[in-house]
């Protein structure tokens, strides 16, 4: 997986609380088990006025020209609630998002995001309100998300964020669960060599 150390990108504000995984990627698009191809259906029921996904909704933020090419999503509390589908972070990353900034996340979505190199950043509600105001005031507003320094840089302001050291290591080194296991291949082999033959 790609390493994540720092990312600068255009920010799109999704001003809605309790955005669930069915809104992120509706259930009718979950037939595949690969990680690609879901971006075209991200927020499908909000982005499009028709079921076929052919008529964009001009009022939805992702369809507005000022947010074209956005790669950082600014959201409200309890983002990613609902079912545990891993397709939700798949859809976000396939669309082009690298980070989601919100006051809080649903636990399962939060964990799934790290597994898919999507960085979920938690800031206070007051800080989130400040960021929404910044994005509204300046077209093409960009933030820099610095995972190594654990901070979001927005204009001349810096917002530190907390993250579990293990998950930070996981993303900075581009690891998934298999890659993490392979890092300990020698220790695993030594352990297995010490076990009775009938256990191997």
From Swiss-Prot:
One of its GO terms (biological process) is L-leucine biosynthetic process. Signal peptide: none annotated. Pathway: Amino-acid biosynthesis; L-leucine biosynthesis; L-leucine from 3-methyl-2-oxobutanoate: step 2/4. GO terms for molecular function: 3-isopropylmalate dehydratase activity. InterPro entries: 3-IsopropMal_deHydase_ssu, Aconitase/3IPM_dehydase_swvl, AconitaseA/IPMdHydase_ssu_swvl, IPMI_Swivel, LeuD. It catalyses: (2R,3S)-3-isopropylmalate = (2S)-2-isopropylmalate. GO terms for cellular component: 3-isopropylmalate dehydratase complex. Its EC number is 4.2.1.33. The keyword Lyase applies. Keywords: Amino-acid biosynthesis, Branched-chain amino acid biosynthesis, Leucine biosynthesis, Lyase. PANTHER family: 3-ISOPROPYLMALATE DEHYDRATASE SMALL SUBUNIT, 3-ISOPROPYLMALATE DEHYDRATASE SMALL SUBUNIT 2-RELATED-RELATED. Catalyzes the isomerization between 2-isopropylmalate and 3-isopropylmalate, via the formation of 2-isopropylmaleate. Heterodimer of LeuC and LeuD. Belongs to the LeuD family. LeuD type 1 subfamily. NCBIfam families: leuD, PRK01641.1. This is 3-isopropylmalate dehydratase small subunit. It comes from Sodalis glossinidius (strain morsitans). The gene is leuD.
């Amino acid at each position: 997986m790609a390493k994540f150390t720092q990312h600068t990108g255009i920010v799109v504000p999704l001003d809605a609380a309790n955005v669930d995984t069915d809104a992120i990627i509706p259930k009718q698009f979950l037939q595949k088990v690969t990680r690609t191809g879901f971006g075209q259906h991200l927020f499908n029921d909000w982005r499009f006025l028709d079921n076929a996904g052919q008529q964009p909704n001009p009022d939805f933020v992702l369809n507005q020209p000022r947010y074209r090419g956005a790669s950082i999503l600014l959201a409200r509390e309890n983002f990613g609630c609902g079912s545990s589908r891993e397709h939700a972070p798949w859809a976000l990353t396939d669309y082009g998002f690298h980070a989601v900034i919100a006051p809080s996340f649903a636990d399962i979505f939060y964990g799934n995001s790290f597994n898919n190199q999507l960085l979920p950043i938690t800031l206070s509600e007051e800080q989130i309100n400040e960021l929404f105001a910044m994005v509204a005031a300046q077209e093409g507003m960009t933030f820099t998300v610095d995972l190594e320094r654990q901070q979001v840089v927005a204009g001349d302001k810096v917002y530190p964020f907390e993250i579990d050291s293990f998950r930070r290591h996981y993303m900075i080194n581009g690891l998934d669960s298999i890659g993490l296991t392979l890092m300990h291949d020698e220790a695993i082999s030594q352990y297995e060599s010490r076990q009775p033959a009938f256990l191997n």
